[in-house]
Amino acid sequence: MKKTLVFLFALAFPLLSRAQNINFEQYFLDEGSLRMDVFQCGTSDSSHYVFERFILEPHFGGSKVNLIDPFNFGTNRVKVIDAQTNTLIYSRGYNTLFREWQTTEEATRMERCYEESVSVPLPRNEAYIILEIRNFNGEFEEVFSKLYEPNEMFNTTEQRYVFPVYDVMVNGTPESKVDIVILPEGYTADEMPQFQQHCQNLVNVFAQQEPFASHIGDFNFRAVLAPSEESGIDIPASHTWVRTILNAHFYTFYIDRYCTTRNYFSVKDVAANAPYDQIYILVNSNQYGGGGFYNFYSMSTAGNMSSSSVIVHEFGHAFAGLADEYEEPDSPLGLLYTLNVEPWEANLTTLVDFESKWADLVAPNIPIPTPNTNQYNNTVGAFEGGGYLTEDMYRPQRNCMMRNYAPFCAVCNRTIEAVIEAHSDVLVSVKPELLLPEPSLRVCPNPATDFIDVFVDQVDSQAEILDLNGKAILSVQLKDMANRIVISDLPQGVYVFHVNGETKKFIKQ
């Protein structure tokens, strides 16, 4: 083993603080948001991230009080770690289109790259932007980290698209309201008045649908007047191809009604014209369809007779992380679930840990599982069928907006109201089960080029950097809880950092 003197830089302060009451002014600048663009590339059973850029954008629409995500929702999660104090200062769960693509047959035979982008409040000092993916045991795993350096010359402030913003309904400041930015897809410049009317129709839909109707004053709706060259959107089955600003299309994964876009950077570029918590894309089409991804975007057509129900259904996905409650045995999306763990979505259960879901809403005389009969209409129980599966997955009530466009069930109502509250300027308590200890070993950035920052919970620890064959390449003495290790002389490749019986893989570029 080659012993090398490695430069260790004490970053000071103990391992990650878990208090949810983060002081915004201490860690963030009130000057907009930081956006990190990446590509997620992979196949059905593997993936990796490629960093694209940091963008400093003019608006931040989130709460300045509830900076730590009080929920445990999403297939993915972004964390912001203050690099000097190793403090968790922001987190948010989300879903991606890439994760759904991984369930398709195509993903078993080829690799694809999907655009992904996360926006966080603008850090005052150096901070790590960490991306995590939920594994099939229901636990988040760190898969990528990048150091944000405020003085880095390539942090761009360039705004690709600048368009007028139309205030559809504004009830208060961005930090105290749920901010929805509405984007037009397939509306030409001459059709902007029609788009504005469709935006008003969307607000009217929310104002008539509980629980949004009772909380309509907690929402802001703004629309970006961004025209497309041509009217309509792509319909691959009929070889209809339209030049639009967001490049949306039907037939996602060959499902006729599934309307999405892979051009997520363009979505974020247009949305950057206004503060937002949620992005809603209105499609200029009379065809039935839409799509929704938690804290990613919602999309629905504006001209179909079922548009009102689709608007609310898709927003249930995007805003509250609600799952589809219907069965669709032929859908590959059922592969997203592991039946020996609880789904992360609030409105599904495998009954593995029903007490952690909605057991408190079930009357003592209701059997679990609950027979799917008229006797139990309008009753909270556990009805088999949901999450595209016909067996071993259970939903709260027989009917719901997330199943068949009925009114939201009691569980979905409760979840939506909790998410609305978390977007306010009132501090929301984080669930105790989410205050689990952070990893006792953290290695950032990953991938790395010149150095890695190693955070441990024990000082004076002997550590090693190993190759994938287990051969020790470097021996390191960690004298502090936070240490910077220069690795510029290491060849490119994958390495394992080993200390106190724990290991972390990292990539040297």
PLM regions: where:
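C-terminal outer-membrane/trafficking sorting elements
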Residues: 6, 18, 433-444, 448-509
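N-terminal prosegments of processed precursors
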Residues: 20-116, 335
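Extended acidic/polar, glycine-enriched regions
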Residues: 107-174
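Fold-level signature of zinc-dependent metallopeptidase catalytic domains
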Residues: 154-210, 223-235
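Short pre-active-site segment immediately N-terminal to the catalytic Zn-binding motif
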Residues: 194, 291-312
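Active-site-proximal segments of metallohydrolase catalytic domains
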Residues: 218-295
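Active-site recognition of the HExxH zinc-binding catalytic motif
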Residues: 309-325
